[in-house]
């Protein structure tokens, strides 16, 4: 899943970016509100993590402008622990959740995955398709055993799992799995699909190519 991270503390931003990538997210990282507003207007994200106190435009105004444009992606605000008024205002202008600093990475990851579940209309922490199980703590099981995946493979399989039995285009996968700094092309998706197919071999789950539509994750005994 691709997310936007906007945090003006560069050391904290780079630390968070690294941790989120390791957890399977594709991350675009910016350090001020103007850049965040521009990317949210021009790029497609599954969710956004915004610090409130940023130069150029604060996180509250970024959220407000986002909602005025009719964009519904989930937003989590990072706030100072004492800034109760900012947290209330953030929720009132359209933020979905907030996390006071300092925080643990485990809590940030859990809150982000909860936001993704809600935005997808799902309430269960475990998603299952045949012998493939995805837990929102960030791991897959195949035939009851942990499925070894690189962060990029996991990000791609996660998108397919949330959209299981429905086709996802190559461009959609590219936009949700890679960040702006990744020097790759949409054709790179085929390489990752090939790797995932090899790892799913021997199970009742497959990734089917639908000409003109993209890829679909489905049961092996279903008509593709």
UniProtKB/Swiss-Prot annotation:
<comment type="function">
    <text>Transcriptional activator of the tctI tricarboxylate transport system operon.</text>
</comment>
<keyword id="KW-0238">DNA-binding</keyword>
<keyword id="KW-0804">Transcription</keyword>
<dbReference type="GO" id="GO:0006355">
    <property type="term" value="P:regulation of DNA-templated transcription"/>
</dbReference>
<dbReference type="InterPro" id="IPR011006">
    <property type="entry name" value="CheY-like_superfamily"/>
</dbReference>
<feature type="DNA-binding region" description="OmpR/PhoB-type">
    <location>
        <begin position="121"/>
        <end position="219"/>
    </location>
</feature>
<dbReference type="Pfam" id="PF00072">
    <property type="entry name" value="Response_reg"/>
</dbReference>
<dbReference type="GO" id="GO:0032993">
    <property type="term" value="C:protein-DNA complex"/>
</dbReference>
<dbReference type="InterPro" id="IPR016032">
    <property type="entry name" value="Sig_transdc_resp-reg_C-effctor"/>
</dbReference>
<protein>
    <recommendedName>
        <fullName>Transcriptional regulatory protein TctD</fullName>
    </recommendedName>
</protein>
<feature type="modified residue" description="4-aspartylphosphate">
    <location>
        <position position="51"/>
    </location>
</feature>
<dbReference type="GO" id="GO:0005829">
    <property type="term" value="C:cytosol"/>
</dbReference>
<feature type="domain" description="Response regulatory">
    <location>
        <begin position="2"/>
        <end position="116"/>
    </location>
</feature>
<keyword id="KW-0597">Phosphoprotein</keyword>
<dbReference type="GO" id="GO:0000156">
    <property type="term" value="F:phosphorelay response regulator activity"/>
</dbReference>
<dbReference type="GO" id="GO:0000976">
    <property type="term" value="F:transcription cis-regulatory region binding"/>
</dbReference>
<dbReference type="InterPro" id="IPR036388">
    <property type="entry name" value="WH-like_DNA-bd_sf"/>
</dbReference>
<dbReference type="Pfam" id="PF00486">
    <property type="entry name" value="Trans_reg_C"/>
</dbReference>
<dbReference type="InterPro" id="IPR039420">
    <property type="entry name" value="WalR-like"/>
</dbReference>
<dbReference type="InterPro" id="IPR001867">
    <property type="entry name" value="OmpR/PhoB-type_DNA-bd"/>
</dbReference>
<keyword id="KW-0805">Transcription regulation</keyword>
<keyword id="KW-0010">Activator</keyword>
<keyword id="KW-0902">Two-component regulatory system</keyword>
<dbReference type="InterPro" id="IPR001789">
    <property type="entry name" value="Sig_transdc_resp-reg_receiver"/>
</dbReference>
